């Protein structure tokens, strides 16, 4: 990282290292968020391309990602997700993506930060019945999933709260980015 013209930050945990290099070595950084909304992924790639002075041709990848979502929706039209924060991404952004794709998200397990409020605002408008739970809350030890309506979970923590539902842990070391995150 210390010999680069700029650093590319793909995970928020790397931001502090990039800021340190910027402050100590005057190496700028660009942060790209892990997103699951295909329109936002496309916008982010376009903005990144402008910074680099290139054009990305991502239509094929976007179409594939949107086809993957459509196929899953066709196969599981009743999918109702609990999304946790112990996964590769922001649970609020992923929940917003799932709702925009036409799925239900009755529950989100996550820690609210200033970065999440843009998603929370949209979620409250599109899915006011979605509940947000904090993993830090001691009473979560007594959480009862019986009446949640959840039939699928994403994130290790969501799987913990719903042990009888299918779970995608989604927190491996190899973390898909961009459209690959949608298709996998």
Briefly describe each language-model feature range.
Residues 1-184:
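An N-terminal assembly and electron-transfer interface module characteristic of large anaerobic redox
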